[in-house]
């Protein structure tokens, strides 16, 4: 007959009766070192303090355990993880499309958008699309891309600049300069 299924704990740290060692290196509520004590004695001290006995590093010899309020510990841990996640900035690639015949007013609006994207810390992808007979005037497209590059010179560095046309478009990628 097979043994019963063992329910695997989802906790990262073993607490109280889950700890398997006979002796543990104990740390008190305020972080003071108590020393190497038996598991039974450590559990008694934790109960006296009205807290949990938490195994901090199970691979140490003997395992290191701390007397603490486990619920509060988990709350603090999740709080710090949320803070770290909030501070992380995900860099996105924003795309702005131009045409060889893009007029001055439209050019300025699109340039303003590019500046905003770069100031927000995002990368910008400039796509220059050729339609119909515009393919015959590829040098106009290169002039537009060079003008964009010059206008954004103090804000961005060019990550990739097209040497030749790919299909019916030229693509330039800009990254914000580090401050």
From Swiss-Prot:
It is found in: Cytoplasm. The lineage of its organism: Bacteria, Pseudomonadati, Pseudomonadota, Gammaproteobacteria, Enterobacterales. GO terms for cellular component: cytosol; membrane. The record marks 107, 110 as: Important for 30S binding. Pfam families: IF3_C, IF3_N. Monomer. The keyword Isomerase does not apply. This is Translation initiation factor IF-3. GO terms for biological process: ribosome disassembly. It comes from Proteus hauseri.
């Amino acid at each position: 007959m097979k043994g019963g299924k063992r329910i695997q704990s989802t906790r990262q740290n073993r607490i109280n009766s889950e700890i398997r060692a006979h002796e543990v290196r104990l740390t008190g509520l305020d972080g003071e070192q108590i020393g190497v004590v038996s598991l039974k004695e450590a559990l008694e001290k934790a109960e006296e303090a009205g807290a949990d006995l938490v195994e901090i590093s199970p691979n140490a010899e003997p395992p290191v355990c701390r007397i603490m309020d486990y619920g509060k510990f988990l709350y603090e841990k999740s709080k710090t993880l949320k803070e770290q996640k909030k501070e992380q900035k995900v860099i996105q690639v924003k795309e702005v499309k131009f045409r060889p015949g893009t007029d001055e007013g439209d050019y300025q609006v699109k340039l303003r958008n590019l500046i905003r994207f770069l100031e927000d810390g995002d990368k910008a992808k400039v796509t220059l699309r050729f339609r119909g007979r515009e393919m015959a005037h590829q040098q106009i497209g290169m002039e537009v891309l060079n003008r964009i590059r010059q206008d954004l010179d103090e804000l961005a560095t060019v990550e990739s600049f097209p040497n030749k046309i790919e299909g019916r478009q030229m693509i330039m990628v800009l990254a914000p300069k580090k401050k």
